[in-house]
Amino acid sequence: MAKQLLFNEEARKKLLSGVEQISSAVKVTLGPKGRNVLLEKGYGAPTVTKDGVSVAKEVELEDPFENMGAQLLKEVATKTNDVAGDGTTTATVLAYSMVREGLKAVAAGMTPLELKRGMDKAVAIAVDDIKQNSKGIKSNEEVAHVASVSANNDKEIGRILASAIEKVGNDGVIDVDEAQTMETVTEFVEGMQFDRGYISSYFVTDRDRMETVYENPYILIYDKSISTMKDLLPLLEKIAQTGRPLLIIAEDVEGEALATLVVNSLRGTLKTCAVKAPGFGDRRKEMLEDIAILSGGQVISEDLGLKLESADIALLGQAKSVKVDKENTTIIDGSGKSKDIKDRIEQIKKQIEASTSDYDSEKLKERLAKLSGGVAVIKIGAVTEVEMKEKKHRVEDALNATRAAIEEGIVAGGGLALIQAAAALEKADLSGLTPDEAVGFKIVRRALEEPIRQISENAGIDGAVVAEKAKEKRGIGFDASKMEWVDMIKVGIIDPAKVTRSALQNAASVSGLLLTTECAIAAIPEKSSSTPPAPDMGGMGGMY
């Protein structure tokens, strides 16, 4: 296929246009008075969202070069969401400002690599300032504040999440589901989650969420790889007679065995899902044993004299339900005996006490949390399906933000931590930088003002005035929902430090890539063939 190439200024202009379009769509959602964005779906009602990453994911531009710029900015939002779970709109606004000002500097003849070096130095100082001013969160009230701010100032969501985290602990698993009623409720169930997803996406049962969900499944726990069908067939035939689904946890499932399981799942003959066993080496054996005890099954292992081909249904674990996505597997309400589970928990606690290695101790604590923490299921209720999906998005955002806050602490929200990091950059000594590096440094300093400007403008206030005043006194910022100046942390307008830090680092990373781009290559769009319609057959009058 033939390709088209753009170079230098021409390429950068097109990329900037794409970046600008996606930024314009995303930035309107920022802050307490951010606006909604409507997303058209292929079927049903449009989705209403204020979630930056959901908006970014929908953007596909017609021009291939503009689309490249948009996709790079989409990467900023997605990466920030993956690492910190929130801050996608902030990251997008920061990146657009850096790209816009950076490309102006390149057009004026400055060296892109030196600009990037200056930007990296500024980001390092700003990140350090954010870390130094972060404050650890301890109380349940502070957890609720973080959650409600991330959920667009919804106090009810903050309260629900704080109560769930208090119940299952910081490392416990919290699942967000749709309720069948208008009420939003929280249920606590015993369960375990480990970081392995489905081996093949063909096992997925819910295409919208890309998840496999099975009720009342059997659980096969095997400590080796399964590649041939003959070993597994006798057991599958017995399970098929029961009509219940099967979750297979093994070192790996590949080749003929995987193909057969996929075909059976797609046909509906036997609902199955295969996942790789968690952990490595001896730790994997211990984790498989944990799963077996929780589900009331047994690890099928030749070390114990058990072979897969002669395994019986009695050796399989069971659970009320399992949920598998591309990264995690959650086993809810396993059928294991509570005495066996308690004994296992006590055994792990003794191992933690005896452990001399910090790493081993940390891994043992993770296993303990999985066995004893259980799973909190938050069921989101709303009047309409559109409202329910929008609320569910906000709850998922808030949960991620809260976890990030527990991990790295909190900073003042509302863009204040970033603009006060900009104030720290103003005091920095630039004498050791080249002129072009100094410009790169100032580009970041200017970009750090952009989130507070955008929050103010979304609330109908002049952003430049708010930005200048916000630099005056540390901790005092503009509450856009009440339109007043307040002590941000005291009134609970807070952001997780991890979210703010990740947004800045990811924005600077992608901006640097765009600034140092000299050539863009894209496929030439195919022209649709416009075949003229066949002429009517003249002279055929009188025929019926």
UniProtKB/Swiss-Prot annotation:
It is found in: Cytoplasm. GO terms for molecular function: ATP binding; ATP-dependent protein folding chaperone; isomerase activity; unfolded protein binding. ATP binds at residues 29-32, 50, 86-90, 414, 495. The keyword Coiled coil does not apply. PROSITE patterns: CHAPERONINS_CPN60. One of its GO terms (cellular component) is cytoplasm. NCBIfam families: GroEL (TIGR02348), PRK00013.1 (NF000592), PRK12849.1 (NF009487), PRK12850.1 (NF009488), PRK12851.1 (NF009489). HAMAP family: CH60. Belongs to the chaperonin (HSP60) family. This is one of the most abundant proteins of T.pallidum and is highly antigenic. This is Chaperonin GroEL. The lineage of its organism: Bacteria, Pseudomonadati, Spirochaetota, Spirochaetia, Spirochaetales.
